[in-house]
Amino acid sequence: MSKILVFGHQNPDTDAIASSYAFDYLAKKAFDLDTEVVALGDPNEETAFALDYFGVSAPRVVTSAKAEGASHVILTDHNEFPQSISDIREVEVYGIVDHHRVANFETANPLYMRVEPVGSASSIVYRLFKENRVDVPKDIAGLLLSGLISDTLLLKSPTTHASDHRVAVELAELAGVKLEEYGMAMLKAGTNLASKSEAELIDIDAKTFELNGNAVRVAQVNTVDIAEVLERKEAIEAAIKEVMASEGYSDFVLMITDIVNSNSEILALGANMDKVEAAFSFKLEDNHAFLAGAVSRKKQVVPQLTESFGA
């Protein structure tokens, strides 16, 4: 078997980078696999903060597994093929570690698959370290903690599992950081949107979902000031329309999430706005609406859209 590539989803967030980096280490230590961690995009500013803090180099970016001479891959923090590497259907999926819904996914052969309804893929990878009695190095503990903090907004998201609190405390101790202090510093590092173009902003953390025959792009940006982001609304809408035309998305839903007050503004464009409105029981005014208490795409947006588009 050729070298196995380990990677998270396209437009990688902190959990995608952290879980793949840590699982690559575990695969070598516990399973004696010939693996290499790579990424499907450059780290965002939040992830770059975590990597720099713990002295870890970002994984190299690849666009094709076969171009790297790999015939097998391991996916972390995702399983849906539209969110994965470009030639995912041409290689064999050797394993998956994920915490999302399972959809748009099939394999020709059996595989290792660990999917749990917890706050982050990093939480699962940490559990695998413990199950296999592999010590967690300080830098990897820091990355796993960062992945958990990122995906749960410092354990405030409704996706947070009861076990994640204990995991966070243990990882913080292993990483040698104060949980709240480090967590807020990392999250704030990811809210610097002023330096991003509108095209970059809507692609920072975006995933495509196949919903009843529609390609729906759902993106999320974190901020401490929603109004500041909405000041760029006209330019953001222009960027959304451009990417919808070029990529063939039927609809685009952008979550602008206030990480301090735990609310989101939804900015949406596309052919099925009636379904978007029905999903959240709100009325879009000038293409946007407030969604109180919403911070999680995985739990508070995608399931609702899936149900509405399927109705």
From Swiss-Prot:
Compartments in which it is found: Cytoplasm
Catalytic activity: diphosphate + H2O = 2 phosphate + H(+)
Cofactor(s) of this protein: Mn(2+)
UniProt keyword Electron transport present: no
Annotated EC: 3.6.1.1
Keywords linked to the UniProt accession: Cytoplasm, Hydrolase, Manganese, Metal-binding
GO MF terms, alphabetically ordered: inorganic diphosphate phosphatase activity; manganese ion binding
GO CC, alphabetical: cytoplasm
Cofactor note: Binds 2 manganese ions per subunit.
Annotated positions binding Mn(2+) 1: 9, 13, 77
Binding site for Mn(2+) 2: 15, 77, 99, 151
Residues that span the membrane, as ranges: none
Family membership: Belongs to the PPase class C family.
NCBIfam families noted in UniProt: PRK05427.1
Name of the protein: Probable manganese-dependent inorganic pyrophosphatase
Gene: ppaC
